[in-house]
């Protein structure tokens, strides 16, 4: 077996012995850092560099819940509950905020059509369309847990308030957490 130093080239298949290629033998443009990965980058010496493996990391999780009955007859979105509210300060402006929620909805009239949405400070993230609720009525009282999810890109590193809002489609009474059911609302900051 021949011993080589520097770059090795050949026109046919070359075999490298086991346990020979290590950090010292790689042609990389920078020094390694624990937790970093080796990434191909054209233009760098050797075409490789050590970089933080980004994207998709959960940076923080905040959960809120409420079990007190809250009701409204408003046909415009109003604050559903001061407890179904999350304050979050994104770590980077490129972060996304992903929400999931299980919201206990109740309508006193089967055709009240309660709707819920998420507000970022004063902005309705559904654009007024709502993110969940009763879409059909049967004339009876109804209670249901509505699952909601939404992905937001706030482009901010300042504290942001996200809150559940509710409205009645008909002006009849609608409620959250009727009979002390529990609603939950969770935010995940996802690194870019």
Regions found by a protein language model. Give the residues of each.
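Extracellular repetitive beta-rich solenoid segments
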Residues: 1-57, 92-93, 192
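Short, solvent-exposed loop/turn segments enriched in Ser/Thr/Gly
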Residues: 34, 80-82
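Terminal beta-strand-rich extracellular "head" domains
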Residues: 64-65, 71-76, 89-96, 100-159, ...
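Extended, low-complexity regulatory regions
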Residues: 84-86
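N-terminal leader/pro-regions and domain N-caps
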Residues: 53-67
């Amino acid at each position: 077996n021949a011993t080589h130093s520097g770059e090795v080239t050949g026109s046919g298949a070359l075999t490298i012995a086991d346990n020979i290629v290590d950090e010292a033998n790689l042609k990389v443009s920078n020094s390694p850092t624990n937790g970093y990965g080796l990434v191909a980058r054209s233009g760098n010496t050797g075409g490789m560099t050590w970089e933080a493996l980004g994207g998709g990391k959960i940076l923080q999780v905040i959960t809120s819940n409420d079990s007190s009955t809250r009701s409204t007859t408003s046909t415009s979105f109003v604050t559903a509950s001061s407890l179904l509210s999350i304050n979050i300060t994104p770590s980077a402006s490129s972060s996304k905020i992903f929400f999931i929620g299980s919201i206990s909805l109740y309508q006193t009239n089967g055709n009240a059509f309660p709707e819920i949405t998420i507000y970022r400070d004063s902005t309705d993230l559904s654009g007024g369309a709502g993110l969940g609720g009763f879409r059909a009525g049967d004339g009876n009282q109804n209670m249901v847990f509505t699952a909601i999810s939404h992905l937001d890109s706030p482009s901010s590193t300042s504290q942001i308030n996200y809150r559940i809002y509710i409205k009645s489609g008909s002006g009849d009474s609608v409620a959250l957490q009727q009979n002390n059911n529990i609603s939950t609302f969770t935010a995940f900051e996802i690194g870019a």
